[in-house]
From Swiss-Prot:
Pathways involved: Amino-acid biosynthesis; L-tryptophan biosynthesis; L-tryptophan from chorismate: step 1/5
Residues noted as binding L-tryptophan in the record, renumbered to the chain: 48, 273-275
Catalytic reaction(s) noted: chorismate + L-glutamine = anthranilate + pyruvate + L-glutamate + H(+)
GO biological process: L-tryptophan biosynthetic process
Assembly information from the UniProt record: Heterotetramer consisting of two non-identical subunits: a beta subunit (TrpG) and a large alpha subunit (TrpE).
Organism: Pseudomonas savastanoi
Enzyme category, top tier: lyase
InterPro entries in alphabetical order: ADC_synthase, Anth_synth_I-like, Anth_synth_I_N, Anth_synth_I_PabB, Chorismate_C
Transmembrane in keyword set: no
Cofactor binding, note field: Binds 1 Mg(2+) ion per subunit.
Homology family: Belongs to the anthranilate synthase component I family.
Identification of the protein by name: Anthranilate synthase component 1
Binding site for chorismate: 308-309, 423, 443, 457-459
Keywords: Amino-acid biosynthesis, Aromatic amino acid biosynthesis, Lyase, Magnesium, Metal-binding, Tryptophan biosynthesis
């Protein structure tokens, strides 16, 4: 874009204008670019692997963000360069987010990637309390104390095009600033200079190192307490109070490694459709989620329910046998069909009548440690609604709550010993152009104050077996735990004790 085009867009009323530069990406990876440009607080890296086997087309590297929004309960704090510029209590923080996003008027520029800036971060599980008044107050303690919503204004990004072997460096420029165009060009020049610099070497992750002593996790449940919670849920189901509930347990362990090294191990051992690394300064969120929460692209809503799990086999023949066993398991099929219906209902709440479609039904997707049954539901967003309306309708996913959703979440509040926080919420972005792409925050670690916290759960139905449900939570944490301790252990850390068991509440 030349200066005349920039000034024309400014005259049309746009208050942020993207300037971009394209270059070959044959000497770099998304991770190396992140380490060169963005390895500081309030930065991020988003990557994708399709079908567990093929890297998605775009990876997004978010340079350190100057403006950050944090929401605790109903209190909103906005900082710029670390200085608080807004502090207020609001009735509905989701409304505030939408109003805040509307402050940025950004043109669509032909030839740029579909994401070139927006609000990036997460909406925690407890955001449902802004929507459902029956759930307005969380009764459980919050030992992590992270924000319910944390969104960064991402106005400088590098988008890595894995298909074309190119990358786009993009900066959003405020045309009201003095010499705005020249300053934007200078910022791009500086980015390109940094891209040409060698990467600072990091320690290797040696696959052949000898194992260390077994580490021990601290769990929010003992095995007995978790199995008792499953039995309680089954009683609710038999009484006709609910059809399914998805309880979870949090597991915590001391963690002294660099969080980026956990991400390096995850992208090697457990590549998924949603890989993410967030450095929020006082804590990190690192994840490899297999499941979209909700995607809105050109007003097409997509949700992709995942329910039904088996561990991976050692051979192709073993995998096929496990797939057959999974697809013939009446409990798993019943659970999945229930969640398809819930997904249709959620999408239908914000879709034009007659547009909701089941485009894939009960296909198997394989990941590094487990395989899942997956379906795909789409709908056309109603005229006049926005991506935030879709998020309101769908968060949290039925796969993380149950059915009927509100009653299931009341039971979760009753039985789980701690506030969920990031777990079960939405991780991703809301782009300036109205699109949104969010993953369910599962297979996700929160690293804070020298501890790593990971949470896992499973859907409980009438014929669930408590000990098997406990084992399913351990299988689901396997990729994260193995990566956190890679390459040292050849067996997983033990879960030894409850740090806040249900019996102590």
């Amino acid at each position: 874009m030349n200066r005349e085009e920039f000034l024309r867009l400014a005259a049309e009323g746009y208050n942020r204008i993207p300037l971009a530069r394209e270059t070959l990406a044959d000497f770099d990876t998304p991770l190396s670019i992140y380490l060169k440009l963005a390895d500081q607080p309030n930065s991020y890296l988003l990557e994708s692997v399709q079908g567990g086997e093929k890297w998605g087309r775009y990876s997004i590297i978010g340079l350190p963000c100057r403006t950050v929004m944090r929401v605790h309960g109903h209190h909103v704090s906005v900082t710029h360069d670390g200085v608080e510029i807004e502090s207020l209590d609001v009735e509905d923080p989701l409304d505030f987010v939408e109003t805040f996003k509307a402050r940025y008027n950004v043109p669509t520029i032909a030839g740029l990637p579909r994401f070139n800036g927006g609000l990036v971060g997460y909406f925690g599980y407890d955001c449902v309390r802004y929507v459902e008044k029956r759930l307005a107050n969380c009764p459980n303690p919050d030992p992590l104390g992270v924000p319910d919503i944390l969104l960064m204004v991402s106005d400088a990004v590098v988008v890595f095009d894995n298909l074309a072997g190119k990358m786009h460096a993009i900066v959003l420029v405020d045309p009201a600033q003095q010499d705005a165009y020249a300053r934007g060009v200078a910022q791009l020049d500086e980015l390109m200079h940094k891209l040409r610099q060698p990467i600072t070497p990091r320690r290797g992750l040696d696959l052949d190192r000898a194992p260390r002593a077994d580490p021990v996790f601290r769990s929010s449940f003992t095995q007995g307490d978790y199995e008792a919670a499953v039995d309680t849920i089954k009683q609710y189901i038999l009484a006709g109070d609910v059809m399914q509930v998805v309880p979870s347990q949090r597991m915590s362990i001391d963690f002294k490694a660099a969080p980026i090294d956990l991400y390096r191990a995850l992208r090697c051992f457990n590549p998924t459709p949603y890989m993410y690394f967030f450095n929020f300064g006082d804590f990190h969120v690192v994840g490899s989620s297999p499941e979209v929460l909700v995607r809105v692209e050109d007003n097409l809503i997509t949700v992709r329910p995942i329910a039904g799990t088996r561990p991976r086999g050692a051979t192709e023949e073993a995998d096929l046998a496990l797939e057959e066993d999974l697809l013939s398991d009446h409990k798993e099929i019943a659970e999945h069909l229930m969640l398809i219906d819930l997904g249709r209902n959620d999408v239908g709440r914000v879709s034009e009548i007659g547009t909701v479609k089941l485009t894939e039904k009960m296909v198997i997707e394989r990941y590094s440690n487990v395989m899942h049954i997956v379906s795909n539901v789409t709908g056309q967003l109603k005229n006049g609604l926005t991506a935030m309306d879709a998020l309101r309708a769908i968060l949290p996913a039925g796969t993380l709550s149950g059915a009927p959703k509100i009653r299931a979440m009341e039971i979760i509040d009753e039985l789980e010993p701690v506030k969920r926080g990031v777990y079960g919420g939405a991780v991703g972005y809301m782009a300036w152009n109205g699109n949104m792409d969010t993953a369910i925050a599962i297979r996700t670690a929160v690293i804070k104050n020298g501890e790593l916290h990971v949470q896992a759960g499973g859907g409980i139905v009438a014929d669930s077996v408590p000990v098997l449900e406990w084992e399913e939570t351990l299988n689901k944490r396997r990729a994260m735990v193995g990566s956190a301790w890679w390459p040292w252990p050849r067996r997983l850390p033990r879960v030894e004790q409850a740090c806040c068991s249900g019996n102590e509440r």
